[in-house]
Amino acid sequence: MKVRASVKKICDKCKIIKRKGVVRVICDTPKHSQRQG
């Protein structure tokens, strides 16, 4: 999980979702998981 100011899709499997007002990227590759903060 990376915490970044701007979250972007890295690969085709990445999905951008909003959970409790927090923008997240979830992916099969753990390295690609991101959270905005």
From Swiss-Prot:
Q: Which family does it belong to?
A: Belongs to the bacterial ribosomal protein bL36 family.
Instruction: Kindly list the GO molecular function terms attached to this UniProt entry.
Output: structural constituent of ribosome
Lineage of source species: Bacteria, Pseudomonadati, Thermodesulfobacteriota, Desulfuromonadia, Geobacterales
Q: Which NCBIfam families match?
A: rpmJ_bact
**What name appears for this protein in its UniProt entry?**
Large ribosomal subunit protein bL36
For this protein, the record's HAMAP family field holds: Ribosomal_bL36
Which species expresses this protein natively? Answer: Trichlorobacter lovleyi (strain ATCC BAA-1151 / DSM 17278 / SZ)
What keywords does the record list, in alphabetical order?
Answer: Ribonucleoprotein, Ribosomal protein
Give one Pfam hit by family name: Ribosomal_L36
User: What is an annotated GO biological process for this record, any one?
Assistant: translation
A single Gene Ontology CC annotation of this entry is:
ribonucleoprotein complex
Top-rank taxon: Bacteria
Coiled-coil spans are: none
